UniProtKB/Swiss-Prot annotation:
InterPro entries in UniProt: 6-PGluconate_DH-like_C_sf (IPR008927), 6PGD_dom2 (IPR013328), G3P_DH_NAD-dep (IPR006168), G3P_DH_NAD-dep_C (IPR006109), G3P_DH_NAD-dep_N (IPR011128), NAD(P)-bd_dom_sf (IPR036291)
Catalytic activity: sn-glycerol 3-phosphate + NAD(+) = dihydroxyacetone phosphate + NADH + H(+); sn-glycerol 3-phosphate + NADP(+) = dihydroxyacetone phosphate + NADPH + H(+)
Annotated Pfam families: NAD_Gly3P_dh_C (PF07479), NAD_Gly3P_dh_N (PF01210)
Protein name (Swiss-Prot/TrEMBL): Glycerol-3-phosphate dehydrogenase [NAD(P)+]
NCBIfam families for the chain: PRK00094.1-2 (NF000940), PRK00094.1-4 (NF000942), PRK14619.1 (NF011212)
Amino acid sequence: MQETTISILGAGAWGASLANLAIANGNRVRVWSRRGSETLSAVLQGADIVLSAISMKGVREVASQIQSLTPSPETIFVTATKGLEPETIYTPSQIWQSCFPHHPVVVLSGPNLSKEIDQSLPAATVVASRVATAAATVQLAFSSSRFRVYTNPDPVGVELGGTLKNVIAIASGVCDGLHLGTNAKAALVTRGLTEMVRIGNCWGAKTETFYGLSGLGDLLATCNSPLSRNYQVGYQLAGGETLAQILAKLPGTAEGVNTCQVLVQLARQQNIVIPITEQVYRLLQGEVTPQQALDELMLRDIKPEYN
């Protein structure tokens, strides 16, 4: 098999995990980070695949820098970032596609806690693109006996699954922090998935995608793991800490904090009912306590499960 050259942008926990997976498969891998010594131009030289694992706030800046470097027309761009751009409500793949309209863009997302992947524990993920051959190329580059990669033709749904679940993960952390029990956790995750589908449908995503690895799978992993930064935000809020205190000591970025604000803005514009997300937003803003948020959710008007 011909060696594939992969440039990984971002040397955080997720970027490093993906780099190790690619190296283990015999690919030629270069890693770029803001704090590293190598230039972006050098890291991108001859890249077949450019994979972005940088935080949401840096996506557009880095994509714009790469534009000026004129990458090869055959280069495949892969985004493994989860979040939304507040100013435009763009997803990471939409930013990459707007900067490189003639290149294939692939979304990589799934229930992938980097610490477990680094321990070689088995995991699965999804790569999605409107260009099937591009998704298949990325699938081949990363699939192994410990990391199973599926393809999917719905990049919007796959990307939103990984993005939207971060907000529900904050709520899940609150649930566990308040010791509300298994019944409450099951209700929260299930109704949270309903909100994810509502928002995703508004974006044009397919409902069935949210019941796959990148939706329900990622939701279950993130809502049940103390390794998740978003979960930790909720858990510590339930313990009485302020958001500022939590973020100051949090290793890495909890994308759900910013995503929540963008989602509430969108939902109010489009009249989408997302009560859990609304209460997470109010909690993050300091408008309600965790207990008050719970009470407001439980005392909403009763209604059918599906409508």
